[in-house]
Amino acid sequence: MKVSQNWLKSLVEINTTAHDLSEKLSIGGFEVESLVDCSENVKGIVLGKVLSVVKHENSDKLSICIVDIGRSNPLQIVCGAKNVKQNIYVYVATVGTHLSAINLTIKKSEIRGVSSEGMICSLEELGIEDTSEGIAIIDEDIALNHNLGTSGAELLDLNDYIYDLAITANRPDGMSVVGIAREISALLETKLNFPGLKTRYKTNVYKNFNLCPEAISKNCLYSISNIESVNGKQLSPGWLKDRLDKSGIKSINLLVDITNYILLEQGQPLHAFDKDKLSNLIGRKVSYEDFSVRKANNNESLLCLNGENYKLNENITIIACDDKPVAIAGVIGGLETAVNEDTSSIYLEGAVFNPVIIRKSSKVIGIRTESSSRYEKGISYKNTLDSVTRAINILEEYFNITSPIINTSTELDLKKILIPLRRERIKKILGPIVIRNENYENNSKLEKRYLTDTEITEKLKLIGCTLNIKEYGWDVEIIPNRSQDLLREIDLIEEIARLIGYDMFDLNLPNPIKPGKLSSFQIALRKLKTGLIVNGFNEVLSYSLVPESKNNLIKISNPLLLETSCLRDNIWKEHINICNQNIKSGHEYCWIFEVGNIFHKKPDFSQEEILNGAIYGNNKFEQWLGSNKDNNMTYYEARGKLKEALSILNLNIEDKPTDTIDFLHPGRSSRLFTEGNEVGYFGEIHPNLISNKIALKKMYLFSLKINSILQASTRKNKWITVYKQFPTVPKMERDINFIFNKKYLVSEIISQIKKSGTKLLENVNLIDVYDDDSFGKEFISYTFRLSYRDSEKTLLDSDIGYLHDSVVEIIEKKFSTKLRD
């Protein structure tokens, strides 16, 4: 963003040097990449008057001129210009002047035997124009208002500096001269002098505009105004040309220049369409109702102002008139409807588009313009109609136009947005400022204090905020052109620190410094990962972006590749691929887990963190070459491994068989519950999913909701240490084997055994599962090991015989089974 200091001075009082201001802007967040002294090329150039001209005796093309530059003695200058004559006012380069435009340093010299003490210059030689015919002759009315010897910089209005600012994405207000002026006012604590609106015009809220909802979304707006009796031949006044030129924009004509001027001054892009050309395009008289904003069609094209003919597609948003493309929205206008010398009436467009669609259109066609760069950073729609009004005000100064009607798509929401700002929060975040007493050497006397309410309010008022006093501090109202970056309390605190000066705050950290610590969730998650790793699992990390395969995936608005265009809704598919790749590489087993996020589109967009994993093969031993021994794990072995890994969380996780998970084997899968809440699933992968991956038979998948299991495991009573006396007597074990109906859960059976035993029954474990067709399809054999122990004596068979028999009897009755021999 380039802006001249003279333009800034018309808007804000500047009471410091250009270099000092440049430094303050950079420290304040508006980095000045370069500072150009406009007078650099005309240093040593002064106003002179040609007193006499005589022909050079030794040359037909040279003249000897006596030129008065306000000194006691006039200069003798040999000049070769055809248009030099007596009594004209000229630009004189004195001895020692360097003309950078032609890389020439003026020296006192002798030309064809005649001494020459300077040079009479053309505008080309001064670097003002690209080409010139003869020397520059200064208008007598201008010259008579200045003394001879006046600097050329003053005559050419070049006593100015141009700041080239690097505006960051979080400060879109810096893309306007008024925004930069407000920043300078805040940094220097000086007064603003913004131009007011001379006339306001009637607005018509037309809600029947055909507007693409993606382009004109919330806090967006489209307006179009018909302005008659203008003249495309009229050129811009000098002040307007000068401001555009120093901002790097070429002057075209007054109509185009005013739209560019508002772009620079207010940061609001405008576009002018030639009304007659629009009418010719659609074959009838055009109306504001004909304008629309829509997605382009794949078979359309548009010849634009830069002379390029762009092929359009559905990723480009266009402005249409009677459905015919006339501009690429927010990027560049069409050449066919552009303003030229024959223009007598225009439609003036002012809009705010969704930054995302502007960025997408700009990227697709491969150009970035002054307009698109501002839309991409963000513009407040609350300033748009005022910017349009400001443009029409300037048009009224130069054309005899009738007051137009501004047709707009929506009414402005004048509801104030207030940000609560707490006094105590400011103190906590910023700490005290340090006052250095200049009466003491080496700043040995330092005073520390917190910011006063007056200091806080004054700084926020400097950036246009309005403050309402509250008990806790203030409710702060933000001006529209800062509404893109001042969104939260912390943003306001940052502004206060920036304007006070970061170097003013105490550098010492709070004392004492409390060491950071992990939350209970973080500790539990680390325990969980440790438990899995210790039990042979490897942690993996898969990509959360996947290709589009079904409609229920959440699409990314600006994907880099089609393969990464959507957010994943599961992790298990990637884990199947990881296991398959490992097995193909020669690995005998693959036990993996991952903690990651999945994303759901329905019913509402949601994000869920889960623990997902896969178990394939047995990692306990290697097989002999040529061995036919099966290396696959059974369902219960795999489930036991997961149980062992999760035991570190001290959770009781129950299994309930299910056949409703479509990617799991209907007879070998279960849903997992803890404290009555479903927390995940475990099961063998469905054979249909691995028909082309035969190696992955007997592969098991599991998933757990991280938030649910960590909440259950971190309850306070979970981690209360319970001390037990170390057993001093041996335990006695008995095995029992029954054939059960498969409808009974192992957890139910174990629970019943524990209830049936007395305090001597210490533990119950499932040690064997046997499934055979001879039992019938609905039956299965389970073997349990019961452990008995008395804390005071060694048990005998007679001590537990009756108890063990009682347990067997209860199990037989409860589950309609018989003890196997």
Curated annotation (Swiss-Prot):
GO terms for biological process: phenylalanyl-tRNA aminoacylation. It comes from Prochlorococcus marinus subsp. pastoris (strain CCMP1986 / NIES-2087 / MED4). Residues 39-149 form the tRNA-binding domain. Belongs to the phenylalanyl-tRNA synthetase beta subunit family. Type 1 subfamily. Mg(2+) binds at residues 485, 491, 494-495. Tetramer of two alpha and two beta subunits. SMART domains: B3_4, B5, FDX-ACB. This is Phenylalanine--tRNA ligase beta subunit.
